[in-house]
Structures are given as structure tokens and as C-alpha cells.
């Protein structure tokens, strides 16, 4: 396994270069562009279904662009952790100083298992510096009205999902279930809770093969704040 300190010296920067939105009649795809110079580039993808009869153009939608940018801010930590560069350059969008500190807080407090597993002693002040180098997103803001009812319930196949579905059973007709990369356990949970296919929103997330290869080679690995991935991606799905 590579040394945390040595990796940070050898790879001082992580760059969030941008993202591309690929749109068709029935779905929206997102391809992110991350890089650790001198080590690897990463292009994870997401695929979201469009609502039936959807007429909006998401490529030109400023609100949607901000949601996509923010999901990229969550996604990047899975790739940053391979070498933990001390500087993160954000070229894909603009962040205020307060927002940079918010993201640092999310990252640091979501990496506890990662630090423990790898025997790393670190503090929130020094583990990362976020530099905002990009401009504001393009496109007019298109916020949604507040008239929508019901809940979008994330389902991971575990006890938390089953308990949530049970607690909200009385409002089942208004609710939908949300699954990232559907599999047997998640689909069974939804089915046994009495939700139909028309109440199921499924999205596809693909990890970049370069990260998986670095993990195989002994670069740093461990848990990242997955609940944040669920939260930010489900916001896009609901939008």
C-alpha cells in the first residue's frame, strides 16, 4: 500500500475540470471530468430518466446545471481519495469561501472510516484546500414550484429503507421510490412494500475503471460519504 504522506507530495493537485450533459428524448446523461495530474483522469457517469412528457431542455437549464455541478462535488471525493492531493482545483463552476468550507466539512466528516482503515491522522484545517477557479453556470434559472406532494424515498435494500417505507405507508399513493443501480435486494424491498413500477425511479451510476485499477494496485481506498451521493442525486431525479 502506498503512503498517505508520499502520495500527497507526489500528487499535489486534484482538478474538477467539468462535466458534459448528454440529452435524449427519454434520458439525461452526465459525464464528469476529474484528473490527478501525472496519475490518472476519471470520467464517471450518471444516467437519469426523464419524466413522461418532459419538455424542458436540461442542457440550457441553469438550475439543473447547478445540481449537476454539486453532484460532481460529491462524486469527486471517491476519486480524490486514491492519492488525497492537498489542493482541489474546481474549474467546473464557482464556489464562495463559505461553500468551500461547507464542502470541506462534508468531506472530512464523511471520511472517518477511510482515515481509520488507512491509519491516517489528519485534521479538518489541513487535509484539503479547495480553490474555486471556474465561472458561474450558464443558462436561465428554472426553479420548480412548491406544489408537488409526496416523498421520493431512497431504497438501498437495508433495514433503513424498509422502516422508512413502512412509516410512510399511509401516503403510498403520493410517494415514489428511488434506486441507484437497481439489484435484487432493492427491487424486492420496493415490491414487498407494495409500490408499482410507475412509482419507481431508477438511475445508473458508473464508476471509472481507472479508479478501480488504482485500488487494485494498492492506492488508498475506503468509504466515502455515500449518503451525500444519494441526497444530491435524488434531488436531480426529483427535479
Provide a role label for each language-model segment.
Residues 155-157:
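Class I SAM-dependent methyltransferase "Motif I" SAM/SAH-binding loop
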Residues 213-239:
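Conserved adenosine/adenylate-binding substructure
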Residues 160:
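Hydrophobic/small residue at the entry helix of a nucleotide-binding pocket
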Residues 1-150, 167-207, 216-220, 239:
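RNA-binding accessory domains that recognize and position tRNA/RNA substrates
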Amino acid at each position: 500500500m502506498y503512503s498517505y504522506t508520499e502520495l500527497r507530495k507526489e500528487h499535489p493537485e486534484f482538478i474538477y475540470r467539468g462535466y458534459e450533459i448528454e440529452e435524449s428524448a427519454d434520458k439525461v446523461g452526465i459525464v464528469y471530468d476529474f484528473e490527478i495530474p501525472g496519475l490518472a483522469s476519471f470520467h464517471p457517469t450518471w444516467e437519469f430518466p426523464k419524466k413522461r412528457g418532459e419538455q424542458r431542455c436540461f442542457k440550457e437549464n441553469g438550475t439543473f446545471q447547478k445540481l449537476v455541478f454539486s453532484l460532481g462535488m460529491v462524486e469527486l471525493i471517491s476519486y480524490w481519495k486514491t492519492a488525497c492531493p492537498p489542493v482541489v482545483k474546481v474549474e467546473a463552476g464557482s464556489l464562495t469561501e463559505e461553500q468551500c468550507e461547507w464542502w470541506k466539512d462534508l468531506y472530512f466528516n464523511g471520511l472517518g472510516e477511510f482515515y481509520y482503515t488507512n491509519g491516517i491522522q489528519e485534521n479538518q484545517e489541513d487535509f484539503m484546500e479547495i480553490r474555486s477557479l471556474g465561472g458561474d453556470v450558464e443558462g436561465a434559472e428554472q426553479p420548480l414550484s412548491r406544489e408537488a406532494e409526496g416523498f421520493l424515498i431512497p431504497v438501498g435494500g437495508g433495514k433503513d429503507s424498509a422502516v422508512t417505507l413502512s412509516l410512510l405507508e399511509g401516503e403510498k399513493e403520493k410517494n415514489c421510490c428511488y434506486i441507484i443501480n437497481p439489484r435484487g435486494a432493492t427491487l424486492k424491498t420496493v415490491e414487498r412494500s407494495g409500490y408499482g413500477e410507475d412509482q419507481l425511479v431508477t438511475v445508473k451510476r458508473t464508476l471509472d475503471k481507472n479508479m478501480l485499477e488504482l485500488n487494485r494496485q494498492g492506492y488508498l481506498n475506503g468509504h466515502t460519504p455515500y449518503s451525500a451521493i444519494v441526497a444530491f442525486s435524488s434531488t436531480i431525479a426529483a427535479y
